[in-house]
């Protein structure tokens, strides 16, 4: 059984949680998130926080208990991430390494010069803000942890770090292992 589900998820002041049928909605100072959940879990709000437990009605045979525990741990983490997102928010920082590689904002659109014949334009989805404090760093911010990570990964995918020179877009603090090139 998942160890996470043995304790409740604390709900800070200023956060409202609404649970209806198979949807949980979390409202906070930074915004609102909702998540649909499967009938394998029961999500209940009590005085000490939100409890995510396996739905014992879904057990048909003994092997189902392990599956229910897996779903319970997953939804526990998803609900906790929603609460953190609406209170603190999430951000991912990216660094650009390479001669002539740079980023700039045009309105909300991110424009990257990465050595291609044309600049790469990226329109952030709703709920995501992109900041460019200097031409070689990008900050992706939002309240949805999954969406922030996905947008950062999509930006990084345009020019992943090259293993021989280390040039490209990388996460801040990411270690890129470089190889030695051919010797002539």
Curated annotation (Swiss-Prot):
Q: Which domain of life is it from?
A: Bacteria
Gene Ontology terms: biological process: cytoplasmic translation
| Pfam name, any one | Ribosomal_L6
| GO-annotated cellular components | cytosolic large ribosomal subunit
- Claim: RNA-binding is one of the keywords in the record: yes
- Keywords of this protein's UniProt record, alphabetized? Ribonucleoprotein, Ribosomal protein, RNA-binding, rRNA-binding
- Coiled-coil positions are none
Q: Does the keyword Ribosomal protein apply?
A: yes
What is a GO molecular function of this protein? structural constituent of ribosome
> Could you tell me what this protein does?
This protein binds to the 23S rRNA, and is important in its secondary structure. It is located near the subunit interface in the base of the L7/L12 stalk, and near the tRNA binding site of the peptidyltransferase center.
> What is the protein's quaternary organization?
Part of the 50S ribosomal subunit.
Q: What is the similarity comment for this entry?
A: Belongs to the universal ribosomal protein uL6 family.
Please name the HAMAP family in this protein's record. Answer: Ribosomal_uL6_B
Question: What's the name of the protein?
Answer: Large ribosomal subunit protein uL6
State the species of origin. Answer: Kosmotoga olearia (strain ATCC BAA-1733 / DSM 21960 / TBF 19.5.1)
Q: What is the lineage of its organism?
A: Bacteria, Thermotogati, Thermotogota, Thermotogae, Kosmotogales
């Amino acid at each position: 059984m998942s160890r996470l589900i043995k304790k409740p998820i604390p709900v800070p002041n200023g956060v409202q949680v609404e649970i209806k049928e198979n949807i949980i909605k979390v409202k906070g100072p930074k915004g609102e998130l909702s998540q649909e959940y499967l009938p394998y879990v029961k999500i209940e709000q009590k005085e000490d926080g939100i409890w995510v437990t396996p739905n014992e009605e879904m057990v048909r045979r003994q092997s189902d208990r392990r599956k229910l525990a897996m779903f319970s741990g997953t939804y526990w983490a998803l609900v906790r991430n929603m609460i953190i997102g609406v209170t603190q928010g999430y951000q991912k920082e990216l660094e650009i390494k390479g001669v002539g590689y740079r980023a700039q904002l045009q309105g909300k659109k991110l424009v990257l010069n990465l050595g291609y014949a044309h600049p790469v334009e990226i329109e952030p989805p709703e709920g995501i803000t992109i900041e460019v404090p200097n031409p070689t760093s990008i900050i992706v911010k939002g309240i949805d942890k999954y969406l922030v990570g996905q947008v950062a990964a999509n930006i990084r995918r345009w020019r992943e770090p090259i293993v021989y020179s280390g040039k490209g877009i990388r996460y801040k603090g990411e270690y890129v292992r470089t190889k030695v090139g051919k010797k002539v």
